Amino acid sequence: MLHHIFQKLLLPAVLAGTMLADTVAPAVSLAAQAATQPDSYHDDWLHVNDNAEIVDKDGNPVWITGCNWFGYNVGSQVFDGVWSQNMHDMLRQIADHGFNFLRIPMSTEILLQWKNGDPDPATPKVNQYTNPELTEEGIEGGTIKYSFDIWNMAVKWCRELGIKIMIDIHSAETASAGHQISLWYTDKFSTEDWCDALAWFADYYKDDDTILAIDLKNEPHGTADVKDQMAKWDDSTDPTNWKYAAETCAARVLEKNPELLVMVEGTEVYPKEGYDWTAPRIDYTTMTEYYYGTWWGGNFRGAKKYPIDLGKYQSQLVYSPHDYGPLVWEQKWFYDGFTQETLLKDCWYDNWFFLQDEGVAPLLMGEWGGFMDGGKNEQWMTYLRDFMIENRIHHTFWCFNENSGDTGGLVYDNFGKWDEEKYALVKPALWQDDNGKFISLDHTIALGANGISLSDYYGSGNSSTTAPDSKIIAGDVNSDKLVNGVDLTLMRQNITKWQSTEDVLTASPQDTNGNGVFSVADIVLLTQYLLGKDVTLKSYTS
């Protein structure tokens, strides 16, 4: 998932190098130039306070509300979509739509390539006619730049647009299916390689607070069916112990830049009471399951007994679960009639929400999203969105890309158009002030064309503990603060499924006539309202 406006002068033209026959000049650290950089390159670092809140340098709570944009991890050597659209313009659109943070999947392999100055294994997938800025000559149809040069242009543009960045190691090896590998190492790239890559990256950008965070590894997972490929969470130093690996790598990263936020994801499984990691996944004679299972990277049950310990860097720790809906996988908690309350009871609380609820550490939902199906998947997205708003859970929506097979994206038509219906669902969960201005995580740079800076927000008298709007607008089914034909369509889709169910009887936007029941009469009333008839919709305060 990208945005900016010019004031904080760009990073000194990093790596404006050119590709030679077989080699590229090694990446040079920016540390030597730190003395000449303005203080505004170091004033946006974030940390965690004693209340498990992410706060800025002045102790003001912030809300990270971003999206994911992949490509570097799959072999494109650039963001996907730059093969057709202008990269700068897409970043500008992301900023203008209110996303203040980008989670960008990478691989250990590409970071080590950049660290060593190795040539691109393939030409970056850039349309040099729509992206003349990404060519050596700066002209349409020119020679495409080295991928690290292009990356640094993206960092520069994000800074100018007010977007902050977090990379994640999506996989050790660059591959479109790399995320299927359960661990952070392979036969080709070791745990040490992974640590080296992230330590180099942290050091390289330690004087640029555009890079605010690192997500150490995407979705550690695996089950007891293949024990040597199962990410576990305990107090051992075993090579597959994710807790130990995360603490080790985080120490390397924070030694280079102690100001970075470090995101630690969960595992897939954790042993049930009375069992340990030696247990099989299931006893097929009795069909007894010995592990609690959930989404890849979404299981933090181990952190209750074995919390992540970053020592003197504990203030930089954020736990980062992932959560998805039934169109990704029909999990057992997606039974008929599931609600936000049943999801919290059956999945969310014991797997991850306890960490924030008990004040252990803040949460950033690193991936959530899916197709707009007018049914169960959309219900799940709405429930999770509302839960994150209510509890101020940080998040990065999956994803900007249209080419995510499990979920689709925020754009379509070869990255050329926005899915306005999906964006309307996400928009209420983006950080905004009372006037609907999107809030940047940068103290001096506003977020895109429709936002304000962090200093503008707190300087205008906004409370650091601003609560979400509790007013429920009748007819605003998708919670975008508008009542229009999209809401009418959703009500028509929901009528058969939701009529007379308990969770729409109180303070429901679908109960437009205020009689406590969602029925065809509510759809008729909304239709009349949209046609300009002299009718009144009932609103509530929750």
Put a short name on every predicted segment.
Residues 2-28:
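Sec-dependent N-terminal signal peptides of Gram-positive bacterial secreted proteins and lipoproteins
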Residues 106-114, 151-155, 160, 164-184, ...:
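Aromatic-lined carbohydrate-binding surfaces of glycoside hydrolases
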Residues 375-470:
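Aromatic-rich peripheral "rim/lid" segments of glycoside hydrolase catalytic domains that contact
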Residues 21, 25-31, 464-542:
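Cellulosome-associated attachment modules in secreted, modular CAZymes
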Residues 75-81, 110-146, 175-189, 225-232, ...:
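Surface-exposed, active-site-proximal loop segments in enzymatic domains
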Residues 62-69, 100-106, 110, 164-171, ...:
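Structural recognition of the beta-strand scaffold that forms the well-ordered cores
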Residues 83, 185, 195-212, 217-391:
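Extracellular glycoside hydrolase catalytic/binding regions
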Residues 30-103, 114-134, 141, 467:
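N-terminal carbohydrate-binding accessory modules
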